[in-house]
Amino acid sequence: MAKILLTFIILTCLIVTITPAVYDYACYKKGCSKIQGRCSTNADCCDGYQCHPQTASWQVVQKNGCYPINPVPCSQLQQKNV
C-alpha cells in the first residue's frame, strides 16, 4: 500500500513539474517569451495583441504572462488591431 501511495505522489509531482514546462515551450514556439506567470493554455499565449506605448510595438496582453520575443512595429499591424 505504501509503495502505491509513493508512486502516486511521485507521478503527481512529475505532472505538476512537466505541465508548465510544456506550456512555456508552446509559448516559445509561438514566438513568445514568458516574462512572468505562465500561459494557461497552449493556444492563449499569443492571442490578444495590444500596442505597447513605450516600445511602439505590438505586445501580447500581459494577463497571459507572455510577450513576443520579436515585437512587430504597431504600424505594420494597424489593420489587424484587436
Curated annotation (Swiss-Prot):
GO terms for cellular component: extracellular region. Keywords: Disulfide bond, Secreted, Signal, Toxin. It holds the Pfam family Toxin_12. Contains 4 disulfide bonds. Abundantly expressed by teratocytes, which are extra-embryonic cells released by parasitoid wasps into their hosts during larval eclosion. The keyword Zinc does not apply. GO terms for molecular function: ion channel inhibitor activity; toxin activity. It comes from the Eukaryota. InterPro entries: Huwentoxin-1. This is Teratocyte protein CftICK-IV. It comes from Cotesia flavipes (Parasitic wasp).
